[in-house]
Amino acid sequence: MKITTRYIVGIVILVVGLFTILLIRPSRFVWTPTFAHEDKNPFGCFVFDSVMVQTMPRGYKATGATLRETVADSSSNNVLIVARDGKLTDANITDIKRLLKRGSTVMLVGVDIYEDSNADKAFGLQCITYANFFYNEIKNKLAHNSDDLYDTLHYRAVYKDAHGTKRHRLPRCIAYPDADYRIYKTLLAGVVNIDSAAAVHRRYYILSQCVSPYYDDEYKPDNDYKAVMVEYGRGRLVVVTTPLLFTNFGILSPSTQPYVMRLMNTLADKPVVRLDASMKDGAVIGADADKHNASPLSYILSQPPLRWAYYTIIAGALVFIIFTARRRQRVIPVIP
């Protein structure tokens, strides 16, 4: 066998061996939240959606429809929106109101509502969420048996009125016994506040709050609410600050799965539709949601880098056509 042939055979064996190792070795998890239907990583929703399809009694599906498209659908559905730092526009608020007046329940998970915003004025709620997971930090604390790793989430559905918090007639969907859940602190960041003036006119139900000592008393909120439900029209709006629990990780973890199922039960009286931005490579709420209804060309022209790339391709094609035409239009010499 020639030396060249040996080298070729050796390279082929090496390449095949490397590919085999890459295929059979376990893949590393990606801990970045996507909430995507097809994502099987911890903070995707492949398993979450699969479990909900089997457990929601009236039906469940994930869809790439925007909130506006969902409102236009005449079907009577409850809506679940799980986002990362989601923002509501005035159009989104109008659409949510229409769903609530229709009798639907809308659950907003990971959607920020700032003080004095139009959403705050509409529903009497402020909400700050947080969706980052520091894997290495948690891994180090677990290795050292750190006490500063967990927090206690307390489920105790109570009615909030203008005079304070008290027991009240609870809707069946939230009337569970009190329960405590010991959960990683980083999964429980965020807080919901109730406008005391709005509580005079509406019924608010506090579903859960953290009860452990706060990591920094200087910044500790008065009420560390994590999930709040408000009655609006014929429907209910549920605001949740913990989007990382509505994922594969949250539904598979024994410490969080019962809590997630309690919250999901608020949607169980009708078919549930989860709006998933990843299914259309865009957004289902916020200013970017209009991109779903735009043509591919309009989206390209709306993005400066894509727009200049498009113009460059067009200009290059024109130059190529011109020079090609000039080269082919040669003068044919006349042979005497």
Residue ranges and their predicted role:
Residues 60-156:
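Membrane-embedded segments
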Residues 182-292:
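A glycine-centered loop/beta-turn motif at secondary-structure junctions
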Residues 112-214:
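An acidic, glycine-rich "communication" segment
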Residues 4, 10-22, 28, 80-81, ...:
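Mixed-charge, polar/low-complexity N-terminal
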Residues 66, 114, 242, 275-276, ...:
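Alpha-helix initiation/capping motif
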Residues 33-35, 123, 243-244, 249:
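Flexible, active-site-adjacent loop/turn segments at secondary-structure boundaries
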Residues 1-60, 70-78, 83-102, 106, ...:
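Long alpha-helical segments found as membrane-embedded helices
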